[in-house]
């Protein structure tokens, strides 16, 4: 089975410009492809998994990845899938975020001469002459066609700034530049990027008279159609300082039964034959499949040692054991207490378990907070310095665990 056929079997491909040519190129290891990452945060998220694992699979098959950091396009902001305008970042913020991305990508793909490259489109976009760009590139784009693009439709009623309207042209120029200077013949991206990607292939055809190709990756969604990568409205980060390895493990361990086999097929590197066999598992073995999913992904992001720790801690908690050594922990300071005490809502806030006091009240009223096996029934509950020194094991809902110490 060639790599293209494997991508199809794993359900990773959404749309392609020319299936036969793309199949031939990537199966023969002749593709130099790029995927763009707008560095709007200082960490990648679980939502980037599809792109990262695709780059790894294709590199293993002999193809050359280019991870393109959007140092220039991030200054504009991609309107795709947005109903509002993205926050604009400083050049320093973007450079810092790019460095963080590189560190995380190192776990997935191998960088170096003749291997993967990381480039920053600020290196060519920030030096463009506006008049020259309009004459050489702008003339190749139809405004009528651009306005029909899916990436702009959601913004038309609320208002689409001219700044954002240029995003498609900038992304297309990236592909054109990479084709000329790096031999990049293929662009991969999320399914919501299709219009932008077609703009790049068309620009190359019109300016250079050559063929380039585009392929979109299936968006990672659950059985309800919701994008994966967030929990309770918060991103699931790949940075262990933002989402601990334990919380990362638990996120995947707690996916719906209906989703687990799809995610194993799409995201892990387990052989397809093994996955087909797992697909016949039922009842209690579904939980075993969830643990395998969580372990494989945590190992990929945080390493085998952290994955083992997270699995051990999760098993202990599930079995009602006392091993909380690998549980996410917050160490409180004396100044966070008042007269040697802290109220339960302040405790939950300090541990990052609630965003607002009203959320905390609602959780308490619904019986969703358990501390040291005691279900909290009132917000007047307080804890002392001695309680914290002994350690407080907090459970939020059924699946979120945290420890508070002092």
Where are these regions (language model features)?
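NTP-dependent nucleotidyl-transfer catalytic core
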Residues: 1-193, 198-201, 207-213, 226, ...
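Conserved nucleotide- and phosphate/pyrophosphate-binding catalytic cores
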Residues: 204-406
